[in-house]
Amino acid sequence: MTISINEYSDLNNLAFGLGQDVSQDLKELVKVASIFMPDSKIHKWLIDTRLEEVVTDLNLRYELKSVITNTPISVTWKQLTGTRTKREANSLVQAVFPGQCSRLAIVDWAAKNYVSVAVAFGLLKFHRADKTFTISEIGIQAVKLYDSEELAELDKFLYERLLEYPYAAWLIRLLGNQPSKQFSKFDLGEHFGFIDELGFETAPIEIFLNGLAQAEIDGDKTAAQKIKSNFESTSDKYMRWLAGVLVTAGLATSTTKKVTHTYKNRKFELTLGTVYQITAKGLTALKEVNGKSRYPRSRKRVMWEFLATKDKEAIAKKTSRSLMLKHLTEKKNPIQAEVIATLINTDYPTLEITPEEVIDDCIGLNRIGIEILIDGDKLTLNDKLFDFEIPVQKDVVLEKSDIEKFKNQLRTELTNIDHSYLKGIDIASKKKTSNVENTEFEAISTKIFTDELGFSGKHLGGSNKPDGLLWDDDCAIILDSKAYSEGFPLTASHTDAMGRYLRQFTERKEEIKPTWWDIAPEHLDNTYFAYVSGSFSGNYKEQLQKFRQDTNHLGGALEFVKLLLLANNYKTQKMSKKEVKKSILDYNISYEEYAPLLAEIE
């Protein structure tokens, strides 16, 4: 196989790979490829009647008809996917699929997702030089089978393409490794994507179930329905579609699952939603994906566009990860992470790749379906890949942002805790965060205390509750986590809320709802508080000191990085639990072990 590097005057910002609002029946994808096949059923239908029915702009209708009567048929992104309209279609893919309710055709968002998946399955080719799309040989074969109504052969053909689709390979492996387990969309999202990167976050299942339980307590059916409809991240939506594809292909089953959930010392029977479990056919597919028994391993179809989400670091990340795959395919395996980092930095020194970053990215590549064996610092690419291209922009230097440089420095420091926590730095530095990201920052902060620092506890969140409650044999800590890119100012309104939580925890009055404190033991010797943020601003030290004096409670302000380094020091036994607590309760946030790192990038 060949992974080639080619220069372009500029790069696209298109996303290919996963889909939302796309049919879970892969035969529907063939309709997209049919647009490019002269005399196919879909092609004839578009020209003869369909475009007349759904494209109301006469000039645009003429343009779309003209483009698919040219030879060869080459179509732009806009001609394929269009823009938002009231009810009519203004693109070819919109026109192919019927709309819902009063719409004549699907919306542009759904059309973009159809194209994204059609390209990822190899049915269409994307030409970066002129940013146009044409049909591939695979697409031609699929359309011929579709038009001749050889549906059994078409299903077999698409099944083979599905096993080449790395995201499907990832999900088949995940389900197949625990064949007796039923996976919710939350479980799937938790195991998907690059570990320290925004865009792969999943909504916490605990918050989802707590919300449903509270709605039941309140007798609010509207709130419960809203939670069921809207409580999911972008990653969760992609997982739901991908799992549905496996179900349609017979590789997994789906069912609605009820769970018993404890909330406020009460047990609730709640509907978790759809869960997925592998089938016998799915276990056979696992052998084909991995090349076990008599089955040859399926070759995986990868694109540069698969290798990062659409953030400001995406181009550098896609390129560095593509280069990792290039060196893994070209050099004798196993190969050390340090060697790969050196090879990349030799050609692209401004990427400043570290061995730790290589290993973290290889974990992420596994989590999108490209299997790489990681044995310490030795890496072996187990999957065979189809040829693909690494596009680079002419005269543009790829550089990391200060945040990414800082994260790389931290990777070398965080030797004993999971690097997925580094995602918290990205969330804390964003100027505008989503509700899911804010909730995830709260959950990450709480998890560091419970999984790394030896506390018991729970992420709470929601109205009239702190973000987290932690405890051990000696004390309780009430946690407030804030992702403020300009620094958390710690105003009087924030300390007023914390003061209320401290009183509620101490008094434990059952008439006050919600009784969030019930999860912690009574009669602990001490009750503390802690604020966690990316940074703090304003006169937070004075405010914090005054609050400590007014409430007679000890507490501190921790920059998120300080929390990470405390956890690592505790796990490496450089600090005792007593020393950790002392540092948490120190209202001076400066921390000698990370101050030099901060100074290096200022």
Curated annotation (Swiss-Prot):
Q: Which GO terms describe its molecular function?
A: DNA binding; type II site-specific deoxyribonuclease activity
Please provide the Gene Ontology terms (biological process) for this protein: DNA restriction-modification system
EC number, as in UniProt: 3.1.21.4
Q: What class of enzyme is it?
A: hydrolase
Entry keyword annotation includes Protease: no
Q: Which UniProt keywords apply?
A: Endonuclease, Hydrolase, Nuclease, Restriction system
Q: Which reaction does it catalyse?
A: Endonucleolytic cleavage of DNA to give specific double-stranded fragments with terminal 5'-phosphates
| UniProt-listed Pfam families | FokI_cleav_dom, FokI_D1, FokI_dom_2
SUPFAM superfamilies from the UniProt entry: Restriction endonuclease-like, Winged helix' DNA-binding domain
Q: Does the keyword Ribonucleoprotein apply?
A: no
* Matches recorded under InterPro entries: FokI_cleavage_dom, FokI_D1, FokI_D2, FokI_dom_1_2, Restrct_endonuc-II-like, WH-like_DNA-bd_sf, WH_DNA-bd_sf
Name used for this protein in its record: Type II restriction enzyme StsI
Species of origin: Streptococcus sanguinis
| Encoding gene per record | stsIR
